[in-house]
Design a protein with these regions (language model features):
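Charged, solvent-exposed interaction patches on well-folded alpha/beta domains
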Residues: 1-42, 51-53, 58-84, 89-263
Length: 263
């Protein structure tokens, strides 16, 4: 008999626990959702989206409204909407116990600003993806201009390299190699401010200091780019202190194994 009472006790306990969880969950779903706790992370200093801007976009899309009940907060739809924003690299939205919920966002990190021949402006991020310009934010990054043809929106360097039909915008991968090197090298990052693409495909680097220009030439591989910048750094560290910043008008690293200076 004692064993029967024990079994009945635990059955009733389990049923009671299930009922408590059920009604607590039902009550929670009918509760008013708090404003989301939004966390935005970006490598570097160029953040193209703030917490308040993201919240405004969610409100505009009616994915979140003031006094919205918890059960109407659809985190999957919210994630799907946010990941489509071209500034966003990763997103995770989730509910907590009670009526609080979170949105964690990682933004793309722009490393170059590109102006095409028609004066359309794009950004290129550190993974080789293009981003449209922002009306609210400007990134302090390397600027590219010159004979740059149209760049399709949301193109990536990887897509261009692996797709023969995208050869018309092939220079995007060259732009990525130069900007990726410059942003990671403290000396070049402090020195180079602009890059101009000539009609013949040569890149011209324009320093922030001095009046000279740097004829860089092509940038068709990571090895070529690294070799040219290494030669340039040797010149700036060892030659420039003796020659002075104003002695030469043009520094040429276009040709393999050479540094040529012209007055």
């Amino acid at each position: 008999m004692k064993k029967v009472f024990t079994i009945i006790f635990w059955v009733l306990f389990a049923v009671g626990l299930i009922l408590i969880v059920f009604f607590a969950s039902k009550e929670n779903n009918n509760a008013i959702a708090k404003k989301p706790d939004i966390s935005i992370h970006v490598e570097g200093e160029n953040a193209f989206l703030t917490e308040s801007e993201l919240l405004d976009r969610l409100i505009y899309k009616r994915l979140y409204q003031k006094n919205m009940k918890v059960n109407f907060v659809n985190v999957k739809k919210i994630e799907a909407a946010i990941i489509k924003m071209e500034e966003v690299k990763k997103v995770r939205a989730y509910k907590n116990i009670g009526n609080s919920w979170n949105i964690d966002v990682e933004l793309r990190n722009p490393i170059a600003r590109i102006f095409t021949l028609s004066q359309k402006a794009y950004y290129l991020d550190d993974e080789g993806f293009t981003m449209g310009r922002s009306l609210l934010h400007t990134a302090h990054v390397l600027v590219f201009s010159g004979f740059i043809t149209e760049i399709m929106e949301k193109a990536s360097v990887k897509e261009i390299i692996n797709n023969d039909s995208l050869k018309s915008i092939r220079k995007l991968d060259d732009i990525y190699r130069i900007s990726n090197y410059v942003c990671k090298d403290s000396l070049m990052n402090a020195l180079i401010g602009q890059v101009y693409l000539e009609k013949n495909g040569d890149f011209i680097l324009i320093p922030l200091v001095g009046k000279q220009t740097i004829l860089f030439g092509s940038a068709n591989s990571d090895e070529v780019v690294a070799d040219k910048f290494n030669r340039l750094k040797v010149f700036y560290k060892e030659g420039m202190p003796h020659e002075g910043w104003e002695k030469y008008n043009t520094i040429i690293v276009k040709y393999e194994g050479q540094i040529v200076c012209r007055k």
